[in-house]
């Protein structure tokens, strides 16, 4: 039977590869963050080092991903807009995200749970649970060769994290060229067979 599996961070996590997070079942995922008023500050391939995925009966529907958000990894892209951050900046970025955002969640700090709840011809509904709030996010997907690739947009403020986001945005204002965008792009891919 074909293994049709996808999940995300998404959001999205495991050991490092050129694509970002990779789970033992070959699920790959990452997310893109934007800063600056014109979204010119772009940090791609962000992921997490620790996550657990599960694909019941090797199928995409009801596949889950449980993410330890304190394991954030922003090392794949050192872009700072006009140049590159030094490698030491990764620790600063990871700590800023962990300490000034994820640790400030009122419920389930350090945890994001993801589940594929519906699949259609070229789209799927992906359920995210963060800060005790559950939301279903639409994702588009396509098959390229033997790989299923999916993309979606997640607004972190939909999860009741306004205070945490305000803290994070204030701490990172100069790093993010004046603005931190609360909508992130989530990408994931998995073998289609």
Show the residue positions of the predicted features.
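Sec-dependent N-terminal signal peptides
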Residues: 4-14
């Amino acid at each position: 039977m074909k293994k049709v599996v996808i999940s995300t961070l998404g959001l999205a996590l495991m050991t490092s590869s050129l694509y970002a997070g990779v789970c033992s079942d070959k699920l790959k995922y990452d997310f893109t963050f934007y800063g600056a008023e014109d979204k010119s500050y772009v940090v791609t391939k962000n992921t997490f080092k620790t996550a657990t995925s599960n694909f019941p009966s090797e199928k995409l529907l009801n596949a889950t991903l449980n993410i330890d958000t304190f394991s954030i990894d922003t090392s794949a892209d050192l872009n700072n807009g006009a140049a590159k951050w030094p490698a030491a900046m990764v620790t600063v970025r990871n700590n800023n995200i962990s300490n000034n955002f994820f640790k400030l969640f009122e419920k389930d700090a350090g945890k994001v749970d993801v589940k594929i709840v519906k699949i259609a011809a070229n789209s799927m509904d992906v359920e995210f649970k963060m800060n005790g709030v559950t939301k279903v996010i639409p994702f588009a997907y396509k098959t390229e060769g033997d790989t299923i690739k999916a993309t979606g947009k997640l607004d972190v403020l939909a999860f009741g994290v306004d205070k945490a986001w305000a803290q994070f945005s204030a701490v990172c204002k100069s790093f993010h060229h004046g603005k931190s965008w609360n909508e992130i792009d989530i990408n994931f891919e998995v073998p289609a067979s």
